[in-house]
């Protein structure tokens, strides 16, 4: 375990992804502390400029920011207090507060859907791979059906049927439609592990099937389930943003997708309110980059064939260090000459 943690902390992709994810988690947890305005209340004039734009335009009226980012003098006059870090929306809501509280919704949907997907995929995949027979046939048929049905159109249909779905409903819908691929991968790995000698030995000793699954099989699936979980979190966050942007989510909720939906309905880009669309897009981009880097790092550590040259050197150095710490059990060879 120490070797794995050392390799994880020595991986630049993993460190970068963890730092980005930790930043979003910090923002989501301490949202009431780092914001001064309510995200769902109008606390300013419509489309106030961000504070840094207002201050830069006042300090240097002939500068690049004043000429390119603060071109509307009327809006600049309404923003003279510079009270909003990232400006306001068409309804006068603080963009910074919406982004911070939107991180809560996005992470809730992402991790909630990820946990549900991993539970369903692991349970179904392990059951199909270990028990075989009719159980495998039925569960494999269900996997194939879910894989054949296009996921996004199915999501849109279910979300439209439900109506204005909240974050929890969207997480459940994503989980119901996204478990099949992970279950297929887990099933294939379970079929391979089932033929190992330690599984046969456990069966001969009379251990129950569920104990074998919990004690012998599941620990060998941690890397696959972990990578699948990170991928599901990323998929769920992006899917929630897409559904909310298309108007299939709850417009009263605070999320990055709802922010983009409000940008579309209020024609913010037509009036030059670039900050209203840029902020949630940057947030979605960075959370996607962080989770993707973390996913790549987990794959690299778990799968030797995906490791880079630097990764191979880290594994080689760790193996050599572990070999030095392990006492040698070999017996010295007899060098005494034999007389004929």
Predicted feature locations:
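Gly/Trp-centered helix-boundary motif
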Residues: 1-118, 122, 263-280, 284-294, ...
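Alpha-helical membrane-protein architecture signal
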Residues: 1-5, 88, 93-96, 100, ...
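Short helix-capping/hinge motifs at transmembrane helix termini and TM-loop junctions
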Residues: 31-39, 129-133, 158-164, 177, ...
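Generic hydrophobic transmembrane alpha-helix motif, especially the helices
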Residues: 85, 106, 112-196, 224-226
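Transmembrane alpha-helices
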Residues: 104-120, 210-242
């Amino acid at each position: 375990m120490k070797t794995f943690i050392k390799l994880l902390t020595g991986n630049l992709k993993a460190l970068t992804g963890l730092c980005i994810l930790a930043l979003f988690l910090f923002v989501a947890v301490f949202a009431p502390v780092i914001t001064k305005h309510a995200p769902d209340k109008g606390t300013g004039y419509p489309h106030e400029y961000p504070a840094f734009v207002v201050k830069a335009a006042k300090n240097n009226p002939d500068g690049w920011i004043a000429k390119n980012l603060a071109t509307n003098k009327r809006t600049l006059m309404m923003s003279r207090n510079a009270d909003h870090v990232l400006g306001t929306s068409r309804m006068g809501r603080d963009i910074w507060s919406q982004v911070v509280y939107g991180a809560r919704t996005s992470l809730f949907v992402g991790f909630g859907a990820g946990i549900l997907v991993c539970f369903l995929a692991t349970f179904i995949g392990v059951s199909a791979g270990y028990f075989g027979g009719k159980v495998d046939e039925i569960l494999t048929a269900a996997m194939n059906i879910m894989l054949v049905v296009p996921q996004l159109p199915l999501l849109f249909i279910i979300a439209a049927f439900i109506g204005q779905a909240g974050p929890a409903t969207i997480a459940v819908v994503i989980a119901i439609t996204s478990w099949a691929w992970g279950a297929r991968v887990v099933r294939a790995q379970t079929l391979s592990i089932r033929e190992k000698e330690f599984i046969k030995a456990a069966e001969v000793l009379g251990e129950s099937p569920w104990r074998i699954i919990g004690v012998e099989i599941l620990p060998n699936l941690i890397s696959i389930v972990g990578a699948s979980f990170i991928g599901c979190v990323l998929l769920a966050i992006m899917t929630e943003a897409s559904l909310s942007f298309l108007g299939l989510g709850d417009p009263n909720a605070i999320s990055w997708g709802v922010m983009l939906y409000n940008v579309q309905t209020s024609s913010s880009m037509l009036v030059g309110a670039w900050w209203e669309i840029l902020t949630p897009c940057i947030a979605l981009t960075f959370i996607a980059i962080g989770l993707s880097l973390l996913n790549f790092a987990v794959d690299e550590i778990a799968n030797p064939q995906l490791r880079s040259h630097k990764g191979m050197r880290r594994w080689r150095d760790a193996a050599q260090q572990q070999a030095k710490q392990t006492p040698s059990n070999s017996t010295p060879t007899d060098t005494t000459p034999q007389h004929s």
